[in-house]
Amino acid sequence: MSWFTPELIEILISVLKAVVILLVVVTCGAFMSFGERRLLGLFQNRYGPNRVGWGGSLQLVADMIKMFFKEDWVPRFSDRAIFTLAPVIAFTSLLLSFAIVPVSPTWAVADLNIGILFFLMMAGLAVYAVLFAGWASNNKYSLLGAMRASAQTLSYEVFLGLSLMGVVAQAGSFNMQDIVNSQEHVWNVIPQFFGFLTFAIAGVAVCHRHPFDQPEAEQELADGYHIEYSGMKFGLFFVGEYIGIVTVSALIVTLFFGGWQGPFLPPFIWFALKTAFFMVMFILIRASLPRPRYDQVMSFGWKVCLPLTLLNLLATAAVILYNAQ
């Protein structure tokens, strides 16, 4: 009797696909830290890191070695268990969100019928990492950063979900593969342009990226919620932020730009090229926009983005009802 039954082989292949996809995402998130510094140098007419390896290509390895050998210090006045749990949540929450993204017609970690709801759930879970880090550090700057993060995430996740409801209504499904297949003739970015705009803005805010990096504003909060972190714990926060950028870029491509669809090239290549474009856009936004005040960030979310999202949803519903007659 052979142990390798067809069912077991199918399970092993699925596990192998999941491991490969998630390892590629983690690797892209790590290398994006080097790519961001080089691109920021290009945008600002300077060199960026260029000393370690050819053209600075080994800078990431040097940073990893440095973080690995730094003291893993835990403040005596902190809550050790929650202090340690926070970076793990920050690293895994948005990484697991990538599980629903189909990178080709046959490659996806999980083909869920509630794919979009799963992403919204994991995005909501990510804020707990910031709250835990701010509270467990027992530091006033960390706590202020955590409070900012909770208010900002509460505000922007409202229209993060609403911006996707137009896409769901057009596709008739929460499944990511169904949404990609529904864009065979026209990408969702055309009928759902305002939904795309608000989702992209909310995605930047959920990743706590500039100009929505209020929870870790260096000039105001001395690096905010991870001021007490060092070594690999800080590294998990650091890489987790870039994994969030990769995940949000991949979701923008999947939901609004046809996912892996495209002529001539293999589906995975199309998906990678589209995702890389939006990852570069994240860096360009950081290089070109100033950081607004915290009250301006909140006002922009509630007074501009939320009404725009509701109008887009109402217009989409009206068009669908008109076409159904």
From Swiss-Prot:
InterPro entries: NADH_UbQ_OxRdtase_su1/FPO, NADH_UbQ_OxRdtase_su1_CS. The chain crosses the membrane at residues 11-31, 81-101, 114-134, 154-174, 186-206, 237-257, 265-285, 304-324. It catalyses: a quinone + NADH + 5 H(+)(in) = a quinol + NAD(+) + 4 H(+)(out). It comes from the Bacteria. Its EC number is 7.1.1.-. GO terms for molecular function: oxidoreductase activity, acting on NAD(P)H, quinone or similar compound as acceptor; quinone binding. Belongs to the complex I subunit 1 family. PANTHER family: NADH DEHYDROGENASE SUBUNIT 1 (PTHR11432), NADH-UBIQUINONE OXIDOREDUCTASE CHAIN 1 (PTHR11432:SF3). NDH-1 is composed of 13 different subunits. Subunits NuoA, H, J, K, L, M, N constitute the membrane sector of the complex. This is NADH-quinone oxidoreductase subunit H. It comes from Yersinia pestis. The gene is nuoH.
